[in-house]
Amino acid sequence: MTRIKINARRIFSLLIPFFFFTSVHAEQTAAPAKPVTVEAKNETFAPQHPDQYLSWKATSEQSERVDALAEDPRLVILWAGYPFSHDYNKPRGHAFAVTDVRETLRTGAPKNAEDGPLPMACWSCKSPDVARLIQKDGEDGYFHGKWARGGPEIVNNLGCADCHNTASPEFAKGKPELTLSRPYAARAMEAIGKPFEKAGRFDQQSMVCGQCHVEYYFDGKNKAVKFPWDDGMKVENMEQYYDKIAFSDWTNSLSKTPMLKAQHPEYETWTAGIHGKNNVTCIDCHMPKVQNAEGKLYTDHKIGNPFDNFAQTCANCHTQDKAALQKVVAERKQSINDLKIKVEDQLVHAHFEAKAALDAGATEAEMKPIQDDIRHAQWRWDLAIASHGIHMHAPEEGLRMLGTAMDKAADARTKLARLLATKGITHEIQIPDISTKEKAQQAIGLNMEQIKAEKQDFIKTVIPQWEEQARKNGLLSQ
């Protein structure tokens, strides 16, 4: 059993919500005035907040790109027909937010502001320029149009004005002045009974992170960001909501199943875990208080692995040493990964078997219950694995979601076996060689050479034009 020591700073935030399921912080923070304009250039605030700025800038040290498709080629099949089958890297430092969304193959290679596969909403978690544009043009004005339209405007990396009311006099004095800079996030928090203005300071810390580290979808003709929390925040609640509005992100090109793509639901999974239930916030673990050279405490903005600052994070509550806790986390991660792979294997077979049934003449009515099972199985799998830290945030919930995903995938395959038999197909459906990312992409008919060549041309020609225009308009520091 994990032993926990409670220090004075955390006693109320750890115990009271456990027994009363309410916010531990009786004090309420007044809503800070919204800025008339949002200053998106992060460098502007370096003189006022030098330690925070330098530590934020140090997220550029988290530069390694890890190709998740190369690590696990099954993903290519599960996302067949969707840009994630082209390119999917694990997350890295906030300093690369704009660079990575520009350079990923998923955003395509648009030639002009009206070109490309994705909407403006794909910028929404990448830059304080998003808050600036929403403040300037309103949400409808911001969301309107294609992703490429925002290229010359959204140029500063995720930073100060995403989380802080930087125009506040209190911010200039060194106060945090947290704010929800995305109105759609504020509405979502209100919908689940957590209005930001009435939340305690520690609750607000996690809500600010929850603007982006969250599941969302693109709603309506304008493709505006919305959180699917109307029926609740658990995987089944969101699944029910999506089914009710008949939403899908794309149709899998093999099984022709209308699919859901989970994003990065850290807020939902953290809420379901032991830390969230005890109000141990994102900040406590990922942005601890540290000392500068003069011995002054400040919040470390080099957001990263809590084990990198063990004495200031885990050791505030846990009595075990670093090695012991790392072992626990590694074991949880391995358990989740083992079940993840088993679910993926079932889903890969289900997609190819569904394709075989369709090729054999299966009707829409015959396929509907099978496709529902595939949709629900992959959604539950995806919500578990898209939250990269679920082995730490909510390992029990991760295993539960993956377990139900396995059940749904098995149901789909059982129904497929029966359906295929009615079409005279009783032999095992052969799966092509998908042992590497490249072979898997070839199996679903992707011309990766062309896709990569078009992207390289875009990077060399279009992005420099965007940056030149941004500098002319004073949006980038010279």
Curated annotation (Swiss-Prot):
GO terms for biological process: anaerobic electron transport chain; nitrate assimilation. Substrate binds at residues 216, 264. It is found in: Periplasm. One of its GO terms (molecular function) is iron ion binding. It catalyses: 6 Fe(III)-[cytochrome c] + NH4(+) + 2 H2O = 6 Fe(II)-[cytochrome c] + nitrite + 8 H(+). Binds 1 Ca(2+) ion per monomer. Its EC number is 1.7.2.2. Heme c 5 binds at residues 275, 314, 317-318. Its main location: periplasm. Heme c 4 binds at residues 282, 285-286, 393. Ca(2+) binds at residues 215-216, 261, 263. Keywords: Calcium, Electron transport, Heme, Iron, Metal-binding, Oxidoreductase, Periplasm, Signal, Transport. PROSITE patterns: MULTIHEME_CYTC (PS51008). Residues 1-26 form the signal peptide. Belongs to the cytochrome c-552 family. This is Cytochrome c-552. It comes from Escherichia coli O157:H7 (strain EC4115 / EHEC).
